[in-house]
């Protein structure tokens, strides 16, 4: 429209908006200024340092997250902690066990309510992704974990012989699924977690030879990508009791990326939440360190990290008080306040009915 005035342009835009809303329904297009900006709803990861590194206090709802790393690095442990946190808020969780390796006894130790956990062990990749789509479209499931992308074997590969070549079959399967998930996830407010494995690219001379399975589509569609690694062993005398773990947020669409979180994963117990909170409190000088002694409000709580952690375990009130100070220092909401807000949104009976 050559030479059109600002008034003419505004009128044309209004006509276009009216036509779009008439054809596709109200809400299909809108001005951002007409909608109140709301905080991104999240589910905690169970590790306070990782919630802080993510920038918004956890994994955002209505989006996809990829957790990848080497074998036995804590990928499934982290995902199960997120499931447990979702269930604490009254949410419904589903676990699509493509690897057929879910340890329910271990999941229960991490705080997962296995009686209310929806579990599926699909026979092939297409079935797993279709189950995930049906659960997302139901609108009643708060979190879905797919363990793992590498185990989402296409049906054609399962039906074929061992030596058959299927170039790019899994990548095409994932690409199609990502296109379908992207729209429905946002409307259902479901957190979708994909656990992935690492492979080595052959012939790489420069840069990292590591890559993840399933093609590039998952990397593009995920709002968060978490790289989890073991960086050391935790010992009690000569016995190894756990791993020191580092998580790097390599992609983040809702906050600045490349933040790093470190915490302990104890064998048989999962993430050491008190140890994680203790390290953050020491870093903020909420807990003072003098030599090998730690003090809170000018009173000694223990000599050495382990003794101080034990003191906090034995005194939940002080532990909670310190945690709230840490959360406040990083701008995260009070845990009890978050729980009240989440449980007030949708009644449990209504969610169960939808599923």
From Swiss-Prot:
Disulfide cysteine pairs (residue numbers): none
Molecular-function GO terms, alphabetical: ATP binding; ATP hydrolysis activity; ATP-dependent DNA damage sensor activity; damaged DNA binding; single-stranded DNA binding
Compartment(s): Cytoplasm
Stretches of the chain forming a coiled coil according to its record: none
Matching SUPFAM superfamilies: P-loop containing nucleoside triphosphate hydrolases (SSF52540), RecA protein, C-terminal domain (SSF54752)
Disulfide bond listed as a keyword: no
Main location: cytoplasm
Chain intervals for the UniProt region annotation (Disordered): 329-355
Ribosomal protein keyword on record: no
SMART domains: AAA
Chain sites annotated for binding ATP: 69-76
An annotated GO BP: SOS response
CC terms in the record's Gene Ontology section: cytosol
Matching InterPro entries: AAA+_ATPase, DNA_recomb/repair_RecA, P-loop_NTPase, RecA-like_C, RecA-like_N, RecA_ATP-bd, RecA_C_sf, RecA_monomer-monomer_interface
Domain of life: Bacteria
Protein keywords: ATP-binding, Cytoplasm, DNA damage, DNA recombination, DNA repair, DNA-binding, Nucleotide-binding, SOS response
Family: Belongs to the RecA family.
Biological role: Can catalyze the hydrolysis of ATP in the presence of single-stranded DNA, the ATP-dependent uptake of single-stranded DNA by duplex DNA, and the ATP-dependent hybridization of homologous single-stranded DNAs. It interacts with LexA causing its activation and leading to its autocatalytic cleavage.
Protein name, as recorded: Protein RecA
């Amino acid at each position: 429209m050559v030479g059109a005035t600002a008034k003419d342009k505004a009128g044309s835009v209004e006509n276009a908006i009216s036509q779009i809303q008439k054809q596709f329904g109200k809400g299909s297009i809108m001005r951002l200024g007409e909608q109140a900006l709301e905080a991104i709803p999240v589910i905690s990861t169970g590790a306070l340092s990782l919630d802080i590194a993510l920038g918004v206090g956890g994994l955002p709802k209505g989006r996809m997250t990829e957790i990848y790393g080497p074998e036995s690095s804590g990928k499934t442990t982290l995902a199960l902690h997120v499931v447990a946190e979702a269930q604490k808020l009254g949410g419904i969780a589903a676990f699509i066990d493509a690897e057929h390796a879910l340890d329910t006894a271990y999941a229960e130790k991490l705080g997962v309510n296995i009686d209310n956990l929806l579990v599926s062990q699909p026979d092939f990749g297409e079935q797993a992704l279709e189950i995930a789509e049906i659960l997302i479209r139901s609108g009643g499931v708060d979190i879905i974990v797919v363990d793992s992308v590498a185990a989402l074997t296409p049906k054609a590969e399962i039906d074929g012989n061992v030596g058959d070549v299927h170039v790019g079959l899994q990548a095409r399967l994932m690409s199609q699924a990502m296109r379908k998930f992207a729209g429905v996830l946002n409307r259902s407010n479901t957190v979708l977690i994909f656990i992935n494995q690492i492979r080595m690219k052959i012939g790489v001379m420069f840069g990292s030879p590591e890559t993840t399975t399933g093609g590039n589509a998952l990397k593009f569609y995920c709002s968060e990508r978490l790289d989890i690694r073991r960086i050391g062993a935790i010992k009690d005398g000569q016995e190894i009791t756990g791993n020191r773990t580092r998580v790097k947020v390599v992609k983040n669409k809702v906050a600045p990326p490349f933040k790093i979180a470190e915490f302990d994963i104890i064998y048989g117990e999962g993430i050491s939440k008190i140890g994680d909170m203790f390290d953050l409190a020491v870093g903020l000088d909420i807990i003072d360190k003098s030599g090998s002694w730690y003090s809170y409000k000018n009173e000694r709580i223990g000599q050495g990290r382990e003794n101080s952690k034990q003191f906090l375990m034995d005194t939940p009130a002080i532990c909670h008080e310190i945690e709230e100070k840490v959360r406040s220092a990083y701008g995260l909401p009070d845990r009890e306040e978050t729980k009240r807000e989440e449980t007030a949104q949708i009644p449990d009976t209504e969610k169960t009915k939808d599923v």
